[in-house]
């Protein structure tokens, strides 16, 4: 699921440079300050000259702090769409690429994740049968069971969220994070050390896993640097993808990838889809979705104590910038200030205020997992050559780019799996069955193009 991390209503603050000034920062000059200056004897000619300079000044989109306010230049929405669209592509390409690189590098180097010595409890039907029809039937049955479990767990989560069972959800997510950050990390680190023949004593290993897991729990479920939180979310997505790659049967994995993309389409776009209901409920309550479920490309909320002057309550102002102060003096030696708009935003001294710091996009961790499963399966199964792996990698990035383009156009939550997974499956089977035999034939005849 892919969605903008913007304000829930058009009247709310939505610019990335907007913040509420504290009492310690110099207060920007408003229109009321200007009128008071005239009453105190300030030169009217100076004020008119200052207004004339501001009127002829080139319009800067960053000076407009709220959508829908008077004075927004025409075409600003299109400029913001292009600006944030390109920015969001880069902000999501990097984590998705890193997650897939971790998975592919592990698959190519650690043999443990390519050995088939067990199956998940959700895929009980074995594919070790010579009959193609029986193998296909077993893969379809495994897919039905897997999708049923996913649908049931999603609906259960939505019901818990709708009835405000936050403690139960937090406990559920904390238990999942504990298992991923401690147990799966211990298994992963042990296999990597075994593969590269690196000796490590158990106390050091336990201390390393403990530090890694403890910091991850704090960053994901409490507070921590955004970059560190993003790194942990990428890592747990890669660990979960590796588990699926190891324990999902080959045919079942491909059928599940196709089915999960269809389910994602239905769950997000249908009026009564569970993921759509989850997003709409969070928007109605003006609450962020749990960080353990969502990768955010920017900081979601900042909380601070703002000491507001009673005379300026409700004024929405731009942040104080020391560099702007040096260049903000007009020809008469008086500082000129950016425009100040005053939407009806009540405030009280000492009130704890929440503000949106930066616009961004959110991508569900499930999308990271299934992107990596597709690329990892391409690297682990069949020929496992690099042409097929790179083709799937490029296909997923192309699909993600198209999804972000649609997100900028429709400006609502969209499923992130269908386009990317469809392209990935097409590229995988076409490359594995057409391009790879062609390249092998050229290589066997020593022909180079």
Swiss-Prot record:
It is an enzyme of class 3 (hydrolase). Residues 1-71 are annotated as: Disordered. It is found in: Endoplasmic reticulum membrane; Golgi apparatus membrane. A motif (PAL) lies at residues 415-417. The active site is at residues 264, 367. Its EC number is 3.4.23.-. Residues 19-30 have a biased composition (Polar residues). Its main location: endoplasmic reticulum. One of its GO terms (molecular function) is aspartic endopeptidase activity, intramembrane cleaving. InterPro entries: Pept_A22A_PS2, Peptidase_A22A, Preselin/SPP, Presenilin_C. One of its GO terms (cellular component) is Golgi membrane. The chain crosses the membrane at residues 89-109, 140-160, 168-188, 202-222, 225-245, 251-271, 363-383, 390-410. Residues 415-435 dip into the membrane without crossing it. PANTHER family: PRESENILIN, PRESENILIN-2. Belongs to the peptidase A22A family. Homodimer. Component of the gamma-secretase complex, a complex composed of a presenilin homodimer (PSEN1 or PSEN2), nicastrin (NCSTN), APH1 (APH1A or APH1B) and PEN2. Such minimal complex is sufficient for secretase activity, although other components may exist. Interacts with DOCK3. Interacts with HERPUD1, FLNA and FLNB. Probable catalytic subunit of the gamma-secretase complex, an endoprotease complex that catalyzes the intramembrane cleavage of integral membrane proteins such as Notch receptors and APP (amyloid-beta precursor protein). Requires the other members of the gamma-secretase complex to have a protease activity. May play a role in intracellular signaling and gene expression or in linking chromatin to the nuclear membrane. May function in the cytoplasmic partitioning of proteins. This is Presenilin-2.
């Amino acid at each position: 699921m892919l969605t903008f991390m913007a304000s829930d209503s058009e009247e709310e603050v939505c610019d990335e440079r907007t913040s509420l000034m504290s009492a310690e920062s110099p207060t920007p000059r408003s229109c009321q300050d200007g009128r008071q200056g005239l009453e105190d004897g300030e030169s009217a000619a100076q004020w008119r000259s200052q207004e004339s300079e501001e009127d002829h000044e080139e319009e800067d989109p960053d000076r407009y702090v709220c959508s829908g306010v008077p004075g927004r230049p025409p075409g600003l929405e299109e400029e913001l769409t292009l600006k944030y669209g390109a920015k969001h592509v880069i902000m999501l390409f990097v984590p998705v690429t890193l997650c897939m690189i971790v998975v592919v590098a592990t698959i190519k180097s650690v043999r443990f994740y390519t050995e088939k010595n067990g199956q998940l409890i959700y895929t009980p039907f074995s594919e070790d049968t010579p009959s193609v029809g029986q193998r296909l039937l077993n893969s379809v049955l495994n897919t039905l069971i897997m999708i049923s479990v996913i649908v049931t767990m999603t609906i259960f989560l939505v019901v818990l969220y709708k009835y405000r069972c936050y403690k139960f959800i937090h406990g559920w997510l904390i238990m999942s994070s504990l298992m991923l950050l401690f147990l799966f990390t211990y298994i992963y680190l042990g296999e990597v050390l075994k593969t590269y023949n690196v000796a490590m004593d158990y106390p050091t290993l336990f201390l390393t896993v403990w530090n890694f897991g403890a910091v991850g729990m704090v960053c994901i479920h409490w507070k921590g640097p955004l970059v560190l939180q993003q790194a942990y979310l990428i890592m747990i997505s890669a660990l979960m993808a590796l588990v699926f790659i190891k324990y999902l049967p080959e045919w079942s994995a491909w059928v599940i990838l196709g089915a999960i993309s269809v389910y994602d389409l239905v769950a997000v776009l249908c009026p009564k889809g569970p993921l759509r209901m989850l997003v709409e409920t969070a928007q109605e309550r003006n609450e962020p979705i749990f960080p353990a479920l969502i990768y955010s490309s920017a900081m979601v909320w900042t909380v601070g104590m703002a000491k507001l002057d009673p005379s300026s309550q409700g004024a929405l102002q731009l942040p104080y910038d020391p560099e702007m102060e040096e260049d903000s003096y007009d020809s008469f030696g008086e500082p000129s200030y950016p425009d100040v708009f005053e939407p009806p935003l009540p405030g009280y001294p000492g009130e704890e205020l929440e503000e949106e710091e930066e616009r961004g996009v959110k991508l569900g961790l499930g999308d990271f997992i299934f992107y990596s499963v597709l690329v990892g399966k391409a690297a682990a199964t069949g020929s496992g050559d690099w042409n097929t792996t790179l083709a799937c990698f490029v296909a997923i990035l192309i699909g993600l780019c198209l999804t972000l383009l649609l997100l900028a156009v429709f400006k609502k939550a969209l499923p992130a799996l269908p386009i990317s997974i469809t392209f990935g499956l097409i590229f995988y089977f076409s490359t594995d069955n057409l391009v790879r035999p062609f390249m092998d034939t050229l290589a066997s005849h020593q022909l180079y193009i």
